[in-house]
């Protein structure tokens, strides 16, 4: 079992219950899922690009990503309905906790010119979204084997009712927010 999951069960639930005055353990916010999304618009011109993106995403997430396709044709972007334009992975359970641990302990500290995560990236319902400009911050990616630096979106979906509860939950997991 992941260290962060143990920490959540042992200390975070008690801390948040005390802070927000929850009467039941089920009221305490928890992380539901983590979604990784990589938009690969260049895949329209070159099919190999999508294969590389899928390989990187599989290495980072530890499970096979789903290819996302265009829903409608847009002439300005030279895409047609059904063209592959990205990939995404939804992590739940044990893989989610392991990814969260790697994200907080290894990947985020490796971001260039990092000054803390923005607290403005909460959506109003306790979910947190962040963007990563380079996939090479993850230790699973071999720098010599990548074809191009790509970014991705990481969305952490929680059961928190508002941003304050969501932030308290992520703070408990040592997320490095800007002060």
Curated annotation (Swiss-Prot):
UniProt KW rRNA-binding keyword: yes
GO cellular component, one term: ribosome
Record's keyword annotation contains Cytoplasm: no
GO biological process, alphabetically ordered: translation
Pfam annotation, one family: Ribosomal_L5
Keywords: Ribonucleoprotein, Ribosomal protein, RNA-binding, rRNA-binding, tRNA-binding
Gene Ontology molecular-function annotations: rRNA binding; structural constituent of ribosome; tRNA binding
InterPro entries on file: Ribosomal_uL5 (IPR002132), Ribosomal_uL5_bac-type (IPR020930), Ribosomal_uL5_C (IPR031309), Ribosomal_uL5_CS (IPR020929), Ribosomal_uL5_dom_sf (IPR022803), Ribosomal_uL5_N (IPR031310)
Summary of subunit composition and partner proteins: Part of the 50S ribosomal subunit; part of the 5S rRNA/L5/L18/L25 subcomplex. Contacts the 5S rRNA and the P site tRNA. Forms a bridge to the 30S subunit in the 70S ribosome.
Described purpose of this protein according to its UniProt entry: This is one of the proteins that bind and probably mediate the attachment of the 5S RNA into the large ribosomal subunit, where it forms part of the central protuberance. In the 70S ribosome it contacts protein S13 of the 30S subunit (bridge B1b), connecting the 2 subunits; this bridge is implicated in subunit movement. Contacts the P site tRNA; the 5S rRNA and some of its associated proteins might help stabilize positioning of ribosome-bound tRNAs.
Membership in a protein family: Belongs to the universal ribosomal protein uL5 family.
NCBIfam families according to UniProt: PRK00010.1
Name recorded for this polypeptide: Large ribosomal subunit protein uL5
Source species of the chain: Shewanella loihica (strain ATCC BAA-1088 / PV-4)
């Amino acid at each position: 079992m992941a260290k962060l999951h143990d920490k959540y069960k042992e200390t975070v639930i008690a801390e948040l219950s005390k802070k927000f005055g929850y009467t039941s353990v089920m009221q305490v916010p928890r992380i539901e899922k983590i979604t990784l999304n990589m938009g690969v618009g260049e895949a329209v011109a070159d099919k190999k690009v999508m294969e590389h993106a899928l390989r990187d995403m599989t290495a980072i997430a530890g499970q096979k990503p789903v290819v996302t396709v265009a829903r409608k044709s847009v002439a300005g972007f030279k895409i047609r309905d059904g063209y592959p334009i990205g990939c995404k992975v939804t992590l739940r359970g044990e893989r989610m906790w392991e990814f969260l641990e790697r994200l907080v302990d290894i990947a985020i500290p490796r971001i260039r010119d990092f000054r803390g995560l923005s607290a403005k990236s909460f959506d109003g319902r306790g979910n947190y979204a962040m963007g990563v400009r380079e996939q090479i911050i993850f230790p699973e990616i071999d720098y010599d084997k990548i074809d191009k630096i790509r970014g991705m979106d990481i969305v952490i979906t929680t059961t928190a009712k508002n941003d304050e509860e969501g932030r308290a939950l992520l703070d408990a997991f040592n997320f490095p927010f800007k002060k």
